[in-house]
A protein has these predicted regions:
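N-terminal, Lys/Arg- and Ser/Thr-rich interaction peptides
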Residues: 1-20
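Extracellular structured ligand-interaction cores
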Residues: 3, 56-58, 96
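Residues in well-ordered beta-strands of folded domains
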Residues: 7, 60-62, 100
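Residue-level preference for alpha-helix termini and adjacent loops
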Residues: 11-14, 26-28, 90-91
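Glycine/small-residue-rich interface belts in oligomeric ring/scaffold proteins
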Residues: 16-81
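Internal, well-folded beta-alpha domain core
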Residues: 64-227
Length: 227
């Protein structure tokens, strides 16, 4: 089995948490739907192709560096009589993510080639957050094996974490574990769609030791929980 590792360090990143309004909060990592959407755009797939990728690919992420959390506040004027509200948007400055994908060999190879020569410009989250490579060898295909591991750097499911876990920080700039509702899929009805969420725990700058080993994929020996 083969997998794809994509290492990115954008100048800024914003992954909107969709269940709030006046505060445009951000996940500290690319959610599954965002990361797979990035591949779909690079390949040049229409909406139907994106839906197929969501069904086919598995995804995991390690936050190597959360970056600096910043905020910008703006007011949108619709008309003189409309109520005016300030809106605050959360951004992460120069984060560093390692994205992991697993799926059919031909799909992994196609995604690899597309990121090197994309149909549409890849971006992370909103259209202002362009994808910047973390280095020269930022996208590569590696061997993948199934395994079990209790010590992880990747985002983990909430249910696994709450069975018992401890966080071991190894860097001063770290994120303590926090639970999020991550969009992992969409349910389509007519021309509309709604997100399907899964509770996950994200952290950075250290390891999480789970009480029980979890089923993972090993990307060149690196254990990653996949969604």
């Amino acid at each position: 089995m083969i997998g794809l590792i994509v290492e990115v360090r954008p100048l800024q990143a914003h992954f909107r948490v969709p269940y709030n309004s006046l505060l445009l909060d951000s996940y500290p990592f690319p959610p599954r739907t965002t990361a797979i959407g990035m591949l779909a755009g690079a390949i040049g797939l229409p909406e139907e192709g994106f839906r197929n990728l969501l069904d086919e690919l598995r995804y995991g992420v390690i936050i190597e560096d959360p970056g600096a959390r910043t905020e910008e506040t703006a007011t949108i004027f619709k008309s003189q009589r409309a109520p005016v509200y300030p809106i605050t948007k959360v951004l992460y400055h120069k984060p560093y993510y390692r994205l992991f994908f697993a799926g059919k060999e031909e799909t992994i190879e196609r995604a690899h080639d597309a990121l090197l020569d994309p149909v549409f410009i890849p971006y992370l989250g909103d259209s202002e957050s362009l994808l910047y490579p973390a280095g020269g060898d930022y996208v590569r295909i590696v061997d993948v094996e199934e395994g079990e591991e209790a010590t992880l750097k990747s985002v983990v499911p909430g249910e696994e974490y709450h069975r018992g876990a401890r966080f071991l920080p190894i860097r001063r700039n770290h994120l303590t574990p926090r639970e999020y509702r991550m969009p992992i899929d969409f349910v389509y009805k007519g021309k509309g769609r709604r997100a399907v969420y899964k509770r996950v725990v994200a952290f950075a700058g250290g390891f999480v030791e789970l009480a029980n080993p979890a089923s993972v994929l090993l990307f060149d020996g690196e254990p990653v929980f996949m969604f």
